[in-house]
């Protein structure tokens, strides 16, 4: 644990005075290796094989099942890209732990371990991503069985209009559950359970009713208080889910909806080199940029370039990833624990995950690096 007044922390805070987008050239594989090492370090802090996150004042937090789950595919993809098979071990260890803590109803708990929370739809869907990745890697049926049980529970918890409320975070319907739909469709593709595809399609129909003419989505924030100006993290979840579902269903209206929202953010980013952390219904921004949302948008812009062929999406993805590599580079002067990590906000004292290095921000930075490598000329 460190104080924000110690020498290393002061040096890190000084680095965060630089404008976002002040690019320093960093080799992609160097950035990727450092980011992956942070996730492995996060796992090594606890006996349970889950991943927590580092906070500049409070130190390491407890393991987070949801984010551990969707970090697994990132570790396995990095192992392949870096030709570093040792990364397979922490991915499989994490999956084995998640098997042990699956709830009797089939879900996984919300929040961090030790908080005693019930199964939550969104969190459970992200663990399914990890289960499916390890099943594909090992052919161990236990992981597919767990994924199917979880997916069936999610489908059973759905409301008639296609949204999820009672078994979801805050008990309210949210459009970023498109990021739930895709894991359901992936399980369906393997098992053939028709009700999983039906549940995903019902939710997608509901989500499309929440989009305004200018591309902005209502009911998109992970709070009630600020639902009129959602964070880029949940906006990007929504977009990414739409694109992933289109890949699985081949429904052009999903790409159109994703592209409409994405172009609004891209048009703000390309001339300015930065984004705000929140956007209201007129796409007017507020708060410091969220590194998680920025990384996720780099991923979705990469995907949209591949789907549409529109060059600005490629330009935005590359430019954003270069800026994120520079933010990561600043971690070299800070405490050893956070080396290679992506902060919650830039600067570190932004409102979202203040002074913290959430493992999910680093997970999406890894995914962004890999996505951009696929679209470079």
What are the language-model segments listed below?
Residues 1-377:
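Glycan-recognition and catalytic cores of secretory/periplasmic carbohydrate-active enzymes
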